[in-house]
Amino acid sequence: MPDSGPLGPHSPDHRPTPATTVPDAPASKPPDVAVTPTASEFLAALHPPVPIPSPSPPSGSASAAADTPDATTVGSALQRILRGPTGPGTAALALSVRHDPPSLPGSPAPAEPAAGRAVPGLYHHPVPEPDPARVEEVSRRIKRWAEDEVQLYPEDWEGEFDGFSVGRYMVACHPDAPTVDHLMLATRLMVAENAVDDCYCEDHGGSPVGLGGRLLLAHTAIDPFHTTAEYAPPWRESLTSDAPRRAYRSAMDYFVRAATPSQADRYRHDMARLHLGYLAEAAWAQTDHVPEVWEYLAMRQFNNFRPCPTITDTVGGYELPADLHARPDMQRVIALAGNATTIVNDLYSYTKELDSPGRHLNLPVVIAERERLSERDAYLKAVEVHNELQHAFEAAAAELAKACPLPTVLRFLKGVAAWVDGNHDWHRTNTYRYSLPDFW
């Protein structure tokens, strides 16, 4: 595990020296060079169709043989695209070669596909089973960090932490991470974000009352407070006062060592969006208000997974330049990806939230209330909403790939799409946390 060095804020004019255990982060941005794959090839490479077995044609059927796609040709075209950009200046943007610890005699064998049932009718793409060696190592490191570095949870919460399966989650979402150290950047942030959600908002003592003050002070653990000499010491002391702030502070310290200043600022901005969404949901909870469906979806554009896929370049060891990230068409892609993945969470956590005390807002609940539908019909309509958002995300990504076929853009889009798919796979397979309603 990398040495985090002294935790806490950094001077605004001084960026920490990158940790020696994450040597792959580029020192400079290679020039962008247009590449040849078309947008349609790009999308096909992201999500190759899953073959559905059909009856074998009668032997000797020439017409059937002629209608069958040439698997060799299709496979070679797919591999050509997935290899990434080629040509001058694109070497650093190819999907990274992994640098994992050498296999030991007791290393796990290739994993069998995990159990779990997808929501019927949900449009999604399967992902390869995450590398078990990586999953095991990330799981080991994150537990050591949680227990030894940030004292994240009391002993009786250990089962919940293990059931979160965050190692499998992050390995599935970041298939191009060059090292386990890079994967740990995302894993610490994910765990810290969930600690804030659980402890401030939901499961472990959270409450909408006073949430704004708690979130603002926690946000200073990732976006440092700049003040006078008199008031800085009590602020620094506050950063160790509870588990969420300790986790935010430590995870962000690791992140800024590997990220560029613009990547770190992007993450801070996306976390401010997330906290704004938390506050809207809390305000509705305090007044027992059920928003209109469109209002709920607007809230979920902020209270969603956006901060997770948008660090795909940092975790991949490269950078999407700030001007390309800020393009309106890129912002639309990112927003649609976040919106679709968040409805996945609503669908898989539906029964869990119904069994929890109080009323939890999720898309099926809001649709049922506002559109006067049965629970089943509201849930099925929420599936349709997700599917429309997912298709819109993929169409927007294809349009952007065609309009701006630069290596960094294409790789970033692939990374976001991989995160969307990995996020669904984690929800589908995490039967410790999620189960489906009996609507089919």
UniProtKB/Swiss-Prot annotation:
Coiled-coil segments on the chain, per record: none
Gene Ontology molecular function, alphabetical: metal ion binding; terpene synthase activity
EC assignment: 4.2.3.118
Top-rank taxon, per record: Bacteria
SUPFAM superfamilies named in the record: Terpenoid synthases
Function of the molecule: Catalyzes the cyclization of 2-methylgeranyl diphosphate (2-MeGPP) to 2-methylisoborneol (2-MIB), which likely involves the intermediacy of 2-methyllinalyl diphosphate.
Comment field (misc): 2-MIB is a volatile organic compound that has an unusually low odor threshold. Together with geosmin, methylisoborneol is responsible for the characteristic smell of moist soil as well as unpleasant taste and odor episodes associated with public water supplies and contamination of various foodstuffs, including fish, wine, and beer.
PANTHER family to which the protein is assigned, alphabetical: BETA-PINACENE SYNTHASE-RELATED, TERPENE SYNTHASE
Stated name of the protein: 2-methylisoborneol synthase
Species of provenance: Streptomyces ambofaciens (strain ATCC 23877 / 3486 / DSM 40053 / JCM 4204 / NBRC 12836 / NRRL B-2516)
